[in-house]
């Protein structure tokens, strides 16, 4: 059985985002169409369903790095801000988006909070991601036969 480590992250996040749309606990808040994802961004996300992609990416990040807190995720999703003539500077991403996404993942049972440490993935969340990774790896093996070695 393949794990998250065995497949490309971008393809996995895309597939997980499609599956998360079917889960009733995970839905974008009413303010989601109007917000930037951080201070460093100039514009809103272009995709209509960007919320599901961010939640899928956070779920993958908790799987890989857990236990992980909101501040570490803010740093991961942050970036450099263009300040005109002034030198660029790193700014963290917005915390509300990450906080609400983690709360929705907790409600769905994919993530749980460990006091003093942060969020970790639950067995249900690990199984959810590993099943999708296994399906994705089988599809990739048909396209790229060299992947059967792994």
Curated annotation (Swiss-Prot):
Gene: rps19e
Any one cellular-component term (Gene Ontology): cytosolic small ribosomal subunit
NCBIfam families found in the cross-reference section: PRK09333.1
Task performed by this protein: May be involved in maturation of the 30S ribosomal subunit.
SMART domains on file: Ribosomal_S19e
HAMAP family, per database record: Ribosomal_eS19
Cross-referenced SUPFAM superfamilies: Winged helix' DNA-binding domain
Family: Belongs to the eukaryotic ribosomal protein eS19 family.
Species of provenance: Pyrococcus abyssi (strain GE5 / Orsay)
Gene3D superfamilies: Winged helix-like DNA-binding domain superfamily/Winged helix DNA-binding domain
Any single biological process term in GO: ribosomal small subunit assembly
Subunit structure: Part of the 30S ribosomal subunit.
The protein, known as: Small ribosomal subunit protein eS19
DNA-binding found in the keyword field: no
